[in-house]
């Protein structure tokens, strides 16, 4: 039973081995070059591309970079190493061939992401690339990221091929952070692989790291959309980005030429690196990508008959037919060769180098996060763990801790790092800042209202105080008036009493 969004190795069509013929040739070239590095009668490569591949071949083992800085041996030293003191062949020259056979047996993991706005034929392109219905057109899922798995076999070598599709990209009303879904997926696969390597049993490791991203641009005479520019800038820092012009048959030759010039100029001005992980050595030997981007492509799952009567993949129009594999019409075949025939190993190796940098940075971040546990409560730790961090860890000289660092890695596990990644998420930070801004605006409005109310209350209180003072003043006046009246009343009573006493004395005197 097949799961949705994946394909089994038995589903591979007959055309699949042809697609990976370039990868098989790479294995042969590296096998021959490895023998040539140690063999006395080896012949130097004739082409710069073959020389570049020979120099890089010995560094690729099981999809990983190993011993890339080892110098090549000259014929004299090679002869001395291949034989012992008695001149007998000890068989060391066969080791590179055995290693290449082991590499061919184990195969290689390769993940390709197709990104861009909806309606640009990303699904049709993938199906055209492998001449099979790898992605069903009728699958309508609401997931922003869909992964399709397949195993490509050919010439004794197999390729574990993954396709990452991004349906519905750019269809939201607010596309400010639409790119975050793809960026988070790339970062999450890097983190997942780091934690898989820390497990005791690494035989079940799953490598879904994205090695290359084809970004589809809408054909237009007005340049590139802002959404595409922002998204490519974010992706180019995390994956080998290759811009392509979708549905190039909608433009005339002159319009297509001008649009390519506009795209290259915009990419240069916006500082968007193409295949950012490629080193100088690869850049000097690999010029196909950097001379011909953006690639103009036409995709089709239908077969037509060309002018020679041959059955080819193409599109039939009223005015004629277009063979999508004919370089005269588009760069479909060139792009296919660029990815699989010429630069597959470079894409994988450069991604491996980027992964090593991310791994070192992430391990250092986990150690610093463990140090912060002593001063903050961002991570819940036990007293035993706290005692270990305080007494046995030297956070000033991390390298001196040696194996003790793994104790910190156990404390700062994937759950903690996922939480940290969420806290560092640009959309989360932006939403948080927007929420704080709205809160501050609301708070300022409420504070302003409170100040107005306070001012109004103070004014009313002042009016009340004035009224109270006036009433107190009136009360005092009334009290004074009452006192005057009482005084006058007392004086009046006193005078009346004195008059009465005088009259009584007069009457008594008369009687006598």
Swiss-Prot record:
One Pfam family it belongs to: Septin
Region (G1 motif): 116-123
Region described as Disordered: spans on this chain: 31-68
Gene3D superfamilies per the UniProt record, alphabetical: P-loop containing nucleotide triphosphate hydrolases (3.40.50.300)
Compartmental location: Prospore membrane; Bud neck
Keyword Protein biosynthesis: no
Annotated region described as G4 motif, given as residue ranges: 246-249
Membrane-topology annotation of the record: Peripheral membrane protein
Descriptive protein name: Sporulation-regulated protein 3
Species in which this protein is naturally found: Saccharomyces cerevisiae (strain ATCC 204508 / S288c)
Organism placement in taxonomy: Eukaryota, Fungi, Dikarya, Ascomycota, Saccharomycotina
């Amino acid at each position: 039973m097949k799961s949705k969004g994946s394909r089994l190795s038995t589903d591979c069509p007959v055309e699949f081995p042809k697609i990976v013929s370039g990868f098989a040739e790479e294995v042969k070239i590296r096998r021959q070059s490895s023998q040539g590095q140690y063999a006395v009668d080896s012949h130097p490569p004739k082409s710069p591309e073959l020389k570049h591949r020979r120099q890089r071949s010995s560094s690729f083992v099981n999809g990983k970079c190993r011993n890339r800085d080892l110098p090549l041996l000259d014929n004299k030293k090679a002869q001395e190493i291949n034989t012992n003191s008695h001149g007998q062949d000890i068989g060391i020259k066969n080791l590179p061939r055995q290693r290449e056979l082991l590499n061919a047996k184990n195969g290689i993991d390769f993940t390709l992401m197709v990104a861009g706005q909806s309606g640009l034929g990303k699904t049709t392109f993938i199906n055209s690339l492998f001449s099979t219905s790898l992605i069903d057109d009728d699958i309508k899922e609401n997931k922003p990221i869909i992964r399709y798995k397949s195993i490509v076999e050919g010439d004794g070598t197999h390729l574990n091929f993954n396709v990452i599709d991004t349906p519905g990209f750019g269809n939201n009303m607010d596309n400010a952070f639409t790119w975050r879904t793809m960026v988070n997926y790339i970062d999450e696969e890097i983190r997942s692989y780091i934690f898989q390597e820390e497990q005791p049993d690494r035989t079940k490791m799953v490598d879904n790291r994205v090695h290359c991203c084809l970004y589809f641009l809408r054909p237009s005479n007005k340049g590139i959309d802002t959404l595409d520019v922002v998204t490519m800038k974010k992706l180019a820092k995390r994956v080998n980005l290759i811009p392509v012009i979708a549905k190039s048959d909608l433009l005339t030759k002159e319009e297509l030429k001008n649009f390519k010039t506009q795209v290259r100029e915009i990419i240069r001005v916006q500082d968007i690196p193409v295949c950012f992980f490629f080193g100088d050595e690869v850049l000097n030997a690999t010029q196909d990508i950097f001379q011909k981007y953006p690639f103009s492509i036409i995709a089709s799952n239908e077969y037509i008959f060309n002018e020679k009567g041959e059955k080819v993949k193409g599109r039939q129009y009223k005015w004629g037919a277009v063979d999508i594999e004919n370089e005269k019409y588009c760069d479909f075949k060139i792009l296919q060769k660029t990815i699989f025939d010429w630069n597959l190993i470079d894409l994988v190796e450069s991604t491996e180098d980027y992964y090593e940098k991310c791994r070192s940075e992430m391990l250092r971040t986990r150690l610093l996060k463990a140090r912060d546990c002593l001063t903050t409560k961002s991570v819940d730790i036990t007293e035993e763990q706290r005692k270990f961090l305080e007494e046995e860890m030297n956070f000033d000289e991390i390298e001196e801790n040696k194996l003790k660092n793994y104790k910190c890695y156990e404390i700062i596990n994937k759950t903690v790092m996922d939480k940290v990644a969420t806290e560092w998420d640009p959309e989360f930070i932006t939403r948080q800042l927007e929420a704080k801004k709205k809160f501050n605006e609301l708070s300022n409005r409420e504070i302003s209202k409170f100040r107005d109310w306070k001012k109004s209350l103070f004014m009313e209180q002042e009016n009340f105080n004035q009224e109270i003072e006036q009433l107190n003043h009136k009360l005092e006046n009334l009290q004074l008036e009452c006192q005057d009246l009482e005084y006058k009343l007392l004086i009046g009573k006193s005078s009346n009493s004195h008059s009465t006493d005088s009259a009584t004395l007069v009457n008594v005197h008369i009687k006598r």
